[in-house]
Swiss-Prot record:
Domain of life where this protein originates: Archaea
GO BP annotation list: chaperone cofactor-dependent protein refolding
Organism this protein belongs to: Methanosarcina acetivorans (strain ATCC 35395 / DSM 2834 / JCM 12185 / C2A)
Key word Cytoplasm present: yes
Protein name: Co-chaperonin GroES
Main location per the UniProt record: cytoplasm
Protein's gene: groES
Role of this protein: Together with the chaperonin GroEL, plays an essential role in assisting protein folding. The GroEL-GroES system forms a nano-cage that allows encapsulation of the non-native substrate proteins and provides a physical environment optimized to promote and accelerate protein folding. GroES binds to the apical surface of the GroEL ring, thereby capping the opening of the GroEL channel.
GO cellular component, one term: cytoplasm
HAMAP family attached to this UniProt entry: CH10
Length: 109
């Protein structure tokens, strides 16, 4: 079963309820923002910030045989790879990542 994301508006449409469901072995992530200030309080200019490849799982697709991918909504993941399709909804950045590019889940103890 796919996890579904219901959004109230897209940047290119007026208030409309939509369901976004990843197709195939893809995962929809809410992109984790880059740090703007260090823990010591030093501001990091945008030109010096490295892209943080972490996100929160919003929705997952399925394997070719229909079985669920071993991720669930809310999982914190680290991903790699060079290909990710970005979308922006209500000023929030979301990305579609291939499941094979998910490197790890982050579990806080």
């Amino acid at each position: 079963m796919n996890v579904q994301l219901i959004l109230r508006s897209l940047t290119y449409k007026e208030e409309q309820r939509v369901i976004i469901r990843p197709i195939g072995e893809r995962v929809l992530l809410k992109h984790q923002k880059k740090e703007e200030v260090t823990k010591g309080g030093i501001y990091i200019p945008e030109s010096a910030r490295q892209e943080k490849k972490e996100g929160i799982v919003i929705a997952v697709g399925t394997f070719e045989d229909g079985k669920e991918l071993p991720l669930k909504k809310g999982d914190h993941v680290i991903y790699g790879g060079y290909q990710a399709d970005e979308i922006e909804i209500d000023d929030e950045k979301y990305i579609f990542v291939d499941f094979k590019d998910i490197l790890a889940t982050v579990v806080e103890e």
